[in-house]
């Protein structure tokens, strides 16, 4: 093999290596951009769902900016702490929106917002992210079914503990035909969120100055 051939082969190898590096870099950039877009879309969906849970006239602050840290995230089904959002009217907490998760969904974790009045009653529940089966488990979405409205007005005592289950398990809440796992997981997660609120009520409803110095 003469010198010219070796130089040509080396040049081609370098070019192939360069193209491979550029390709890997482009894939990484696209992936990073896609992940950022997904995260932003989830934040926007969370913000919309949060405001949907709060009745008009029930707050005069900016709940998205009024956050209280939460602790013991596993009690909310979370891997890491996420803040609670507090709605205030005339300086007093009127409601708390908890971020929770049902880790035992059929196709993975189901991300939830759980709205609770200062008196401990559910304003409502919204699903903000999930991977449940289209046409079956995805009926936990308000856009697909009114099922989630079944939580409205409920509390720890209404129904009693035994009622916090799907009807197939002897509880109060409907399940879906062919998809019991998904609603069962959501019911369990909402019940846990209410327990968390009850155990941490004083801190979650504290005046803004006190909450900010927790």
Curated annotation (Swiss-Prot):
| Locations listed in the record | Cell inner membrane
Q: Which branch of life, at top level? A: Bacteria
Descriptive protein name? Ion-translocating oxidoreductase complex subunit G
Listed cofactors: FMN
Q: Which GO terms describe its biological process?
A: electron transport chain
Principal subcellular localisation of the protein: membrane
Q: What class of enzyme is it?
A: translocase
Protein's gene: rnfG
Q: What is the lineage of its organism?
A: Bacteria, Pseudomonadati, Pseudomonadota, Gammaproteobacteria, Pseudomonadales
Cellular component terms (Gene Ontology): oxidoreductase complex; plasma membrane
Q: What is its EC number?
A: 7.-.-.-
Biological role = Part of a membrane-bound complex that couples electron transfer with translocation of ions across the membrane.
Q: Can you state the subunit structure given in the record?
A: The complex is composed of six subunits: RnfA, RnfB, RnfC, RnfD, RnfE and RnfG.
């Amino acid at each position: 093999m003469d010198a010219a051939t070796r130089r040509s082969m080396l040049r081609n190898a370098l070019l192939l290596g360069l193209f491979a590096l550029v390709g890997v870099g482009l894939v990484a950039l696209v992936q990073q951009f896609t992940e950022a877009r997904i995260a932003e879309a989830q934040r926007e969906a969370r913000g919309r769902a949060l405001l949907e849970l709060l009745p008009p006239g029930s707050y005069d602050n900016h709940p998205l900016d009024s956050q209280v840290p939460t602790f013991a995230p596993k009690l909310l089904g979370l891997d890491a702490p996420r803040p609670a959002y507090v709605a205030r009217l005339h300086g007093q907490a009127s409601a708390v929106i908890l971020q929770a998760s049902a880790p035992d969904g059929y196709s993975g974790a189901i991300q939830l917002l759980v709205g609770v009045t200062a008196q401990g009653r559910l304003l409502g529940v919204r699903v903000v992210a999930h991977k449940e089966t289209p046409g079956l488990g995805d009926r936990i979405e308000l856009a697909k079914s009114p099922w989630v409205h079944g939580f409205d007005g409920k509390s720890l005592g209404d129904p009693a503990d035994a009622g916090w289950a799907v009807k197939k398990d002897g509880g109060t809440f409907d399940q879906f035909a062919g998809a019991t796992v998904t609603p069962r997981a959501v019911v369990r997660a909402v019940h846990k969120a209410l327990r968390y609120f009850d155990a941490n009520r004083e801190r979650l409803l504290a005046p803004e100055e006190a909450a900010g110095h927790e």
